[in-house]
Amino acid sequence: MEQDKYLTVAAITKYIEKKFEVDPYMKQVFVRGEISNLKQPASGHLYFTVKDEFAMLRSVMFQKAVQKIGFVPEDGMNVLITGRIGVFTKAGRYQFYAEHMEPDGVGALYIQLEQLKSQLEKEGLFAEAHKKVLPSFPSKVAVVTSKTGAAVRDILTTIHRRMPSVEVIVYPTVVQGDKAAQRIVENIGRINQRNDIDVMIIGRGGGSLEELWAFNEEPVVRAVYDSDVPVISAVGHETDFALSDFSADVRAATPTAAAELAVPDYRDLEERLAERKYRLLAVTRQLLERKERALEQLKQHLILNGPKHQLEQQMERTDYFAERLKNAFSKQVLLKQTTFNRLNDRLHYYHPKKEIALQKEQIILRKQALDKAMKQQLKDKQQAFIRQVEALEHLSPLALLKRGFGVTYKAGELVKTVQELEIGDNIQVKMQGGHIDAHITAKEEDTSGN
């Protein structure tokens, strides 16, 4: 019947769907275009159109694939998508089933960074009101960075130069790679478990965005924000920045700058102490001069305005007040002198001369140990060399000649067995002191096998 040649809509749609499924060029398709009409319902799937100036392609990305892309797609964003072409039978249209997506042009990391920054800023992790004030005179500083990089050397050198008395505790950690963020968070937690750390420096030297990425990871940014110990973030060079810089209490342009922010310079303290001493002496001198002028005025008043009895009373009162003034002044001077002596003692205690002397002693001891080790090693090498020379001399063919043996040559070639010689051959035997030429007239082989 002619009606048998008519197909149902479902049948023809299934046929077209099968064609797409068996076509190898449709199984993995790479598409570049602009996202438009983006929708994401409660299911988590993405429905959108990929278009260029000539055409558009309906597309869908299921929730499992959406969770892996690492950024938030938006209308107008240019993307690179990998997936397959298939048929949505209910709507009777072909569409693109996206399996992987990444930004086209601007790197995915930059987009991910800006989106995470916006999210954390809305949560208040960068708020100035939350930031803690750095201590003026820390005694212990913790450093979270690589133990082999230039950053840790710069920090240690700067702190030792500025305030040798400060103890620096380094928490070595990897600063890039898959495990870097976890290690940084763990070390921040360890530091906060202690109760003797005054300030913490986290950071590393310069690098690319990928190399600095650990300090942009959300767990690191939150750990810095939640830290009870004040945090100085010093990631990269002056032009670099990381999200940990925004959540930290203070951001430093470089590791060296972080060390300068963490501790004061003892030389500045000496200058401030000298300035305060000068101001104290000046104030004391002015106070004394004012009191002396007041006393002189009082004496003149008594002389000009009172009889003898009144004068005596006034003189007694004057003596009384003069004594009180003297005592008060003495107490003030004693108090200021005590404060000055205490500050002066602290300055001498923290002076780097002691540390320098100790380091010189350590250098001398290490040099002596090194000299001793080098001499012993040289002696051992000489003895080993002598033993090797003796062994070589023992194995030398010349040593065999000295013991009475001879070496036989035939036509310049060394003869090792009697089987190599025939009657009538001419041979040369080398012995101690010379050689002899010989002619083979007979030979006898050893049949014992020795």
Swiss-Prot record:
GO biological process, one term: DNA catabolic process
One annotated Gene Ontology cellular component of this protein: cytoplasm
GO molecular function: exodeoxyribonuclease VII activity; nucleic acid binding
EC number, UniProt record: 3.1.11.6
Subcellular location, record wording: Cytoplasm
InterPro entries, alphabetized: Exonuc_VII_L, Exonuc_VII_lsu_C, OB-fold_nuc-bd_dom
Record keywords, A-Z: Cytoplasm, Exonuclease, Hydrolase, Nuclease
First-listed, main subcellular location of the protein, grouped into a coarse class: cytoplasm
Leading EC class: hydrolase
Catalytic activity: Exonucleolytic cleavage in either 5'- to 3'- or 3'- to 5'-direction to yield nucleoside 5'-phosphates
Family listed: Belongs to the XseA family.
Matches recorded under HAMAP family: Exonuc_7_L (MF_00378)
Role, per record: Bidirectionally degrades single-stranded DNA into large acid-insoluble oligonucleotides, which are then degraded further into small acid-soluble oligonucleotides.
Oligomeric form and interacting partners: Heterooligomer composed of large and small subunits.
Protein name per Swiss-Prot or TrEMBL: Exodeoxyribonuclease 7 large subunit
Organism the protein comes from: Listeria innocua serovar 6a (strain ATCC BAA-680 / CLIP 11262)
Lineage per the UniProt record: Bacteria, Bacillati, Bacillota, Bacilli, Bacillales
Gene of this entry: xseA
